[in-house]
């Protein structure tokens, strides 16, 4: 990648996409005024129209390769299952019962902070932020109405907790990619990474409790049924035990159907209809993921990604500058690809060269890659995490940004770790 000639023009599709999506929202005051899929489609067409030296058939194959990247396909499968589970669980009363159960035991001012902590534990266990969001976002949206806080606020807590696990889990794609590209041990990277982001997690919990104090801590809980809570309870328990997230969500779909049909709240027809409607509700998100994946591949082929990497690497003059450069490399790659795993794989080899050249500990370089990729991924409104959370909660992804405490704070902690050269290693890995 670093040997490819970089071209700033290769980033034109990304620039167009952001301008259309964000610009139209700022101008009209409504971020739904221009459907995000329309912006992505326009940018994708531009990416295919560029580089006239190549045949359209070849460029179409490249686009399809990007759209069909394993990371994209896994996300699509999770989105399909998440839509089906969310709709089926809601139809048989699981969401309402789960919200009322939570309100019965947890004071309102601690509820959102609790969502962050639960999301963090689940994400660490299953290694996927999107799966965690799929399981918890419906509950977060339901709780927000009961305790008097914006849905974007409670959903942002779930996204933040999910990014905590995405960054630290031993089975997360981002962790594996960072460890492999930097040639360090998983346990060593975890310890280093954890020390850097722990203050961000603690500060996030405190902020969530402070901001929740303005809600309605005395919200009255309605009636609930333990049986109806089982689909969500089962998903949470088996996710925490580390089972495959797709298998866990599929099990939740089946359990919701069995309970709903058994107690009469669903018939086979209404159950299957709910599943179909849930999957259909995710269609926009699925299409968007495919378009962004294809567009990212075209930007790579057109030299846009290489331009970003070269632009950052040329400005490095010191060890501290090299660490900042690694952070900049992976952040830029993440902005362009909207996928933190792909961003780490893209920037990883050059980051390894920089760490070797300037004597950066491999544990630190791996942590920087993972921290900044997760910080950016948790903030971009066109990333899978924000989009899926917004889709489930029926809100704009832009509305989640002001409450995205954790992604912002891990970025701040990462910058502090670079400036103050933390943590200080007593022995070489």
Predicted features and spans:
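Juxtamembrane helix-boundary/capping and inter-helix hinge elements in multi-pass membrane proteins
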Residues: 2, 52-55, 68-72, 148-152, ...
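Hydrophobic alpha-helical transmembrane segments of multi-pass integral membrane proteins
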Residues: 76-85, 105-139, 312-350, 369
């Amino acid at each position: 990648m670093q040997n490819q000639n970089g071209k700033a023009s290769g980033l034109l599709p990304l620039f167009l996409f952001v301008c259309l999506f964000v610009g139209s929202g700022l101008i009209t005051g409504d971020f739904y005024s221009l459907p995000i899929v329309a912006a992505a489609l326009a940018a994708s067409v531009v990416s295919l129209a560029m580089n006239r030296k190549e045949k359209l058939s070849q460029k179409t194959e490249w686009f399809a390769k990007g759209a069909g990247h394993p990371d994209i396909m896994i996300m699509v499968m999770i989105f399909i299952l998440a839509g089906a589970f969310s709709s089926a669980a809601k139809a048989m009363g699981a969401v309402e019962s789960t919200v009322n159960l939570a309100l019965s035991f947890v004071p309102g001012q601690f509820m959102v902070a609790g969502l962050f902590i639960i999301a963090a534990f689940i994400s660490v266990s299953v290694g996927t932020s999107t799966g965690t969001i799929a399981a918890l976002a419906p509950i977060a949206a339901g709780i927000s109405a009961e305790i008097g806080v914006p849905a974007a606020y409670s959903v942002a807590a779930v996204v933040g907790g999910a990014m905590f696990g995405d960054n630290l889990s031993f089975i997360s794609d981002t962790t594996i990619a960072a460890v492999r590209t930097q040639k360090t041990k998983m346990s060593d990277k975890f310890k280093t990474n954890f020390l850097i982001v722990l203050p961000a997690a603690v500060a996030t919990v405190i902020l969530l409790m402070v901001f929740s104090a303005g809600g309605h801590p005395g919200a009255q809980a309605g009636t609930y049924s333990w049986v109806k809570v089982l689909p969500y309870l089962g998903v949470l328990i088996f996710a925490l035990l580390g089972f495959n997230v797709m298998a866990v969500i599929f099990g939740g779909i089946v359990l919701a159907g069995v309970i709903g049909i058994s107690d009469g709240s669903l018939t086979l027809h209404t159950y299957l209809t709910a599943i179909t409607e849930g999957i259909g509700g995710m269609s926009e998100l699925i299409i968007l993921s495919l378009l962004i994946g294809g567009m990212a591949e075209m930007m790579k082929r057109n030299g846009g990604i290489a331009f970003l990497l070269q632009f950052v690497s040329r400005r490095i003059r010191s060890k501290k500058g090299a660490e900042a450069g690694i952070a900049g490399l992976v952040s830029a790659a993440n902005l362009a690809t909207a996928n933190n795993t792909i961003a780490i794989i893209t920037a990883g080899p050059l980051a390894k060269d920089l760490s070797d050249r300037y004597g950066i500990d491999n544990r630190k370089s791996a942590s920087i890659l993972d921290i900044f990729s997760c910080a950016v991924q948790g903030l971009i409104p066109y990333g899978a995490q924000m989009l899926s959370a917004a889709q489930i909660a029926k809100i704009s992804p832009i509305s989640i940004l002001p409450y995205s405490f954790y992604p912002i704070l891990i970025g701040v902690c990462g910058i502090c770790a670079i400036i103050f050269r933390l943590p200080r290693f007593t022995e070489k890995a």
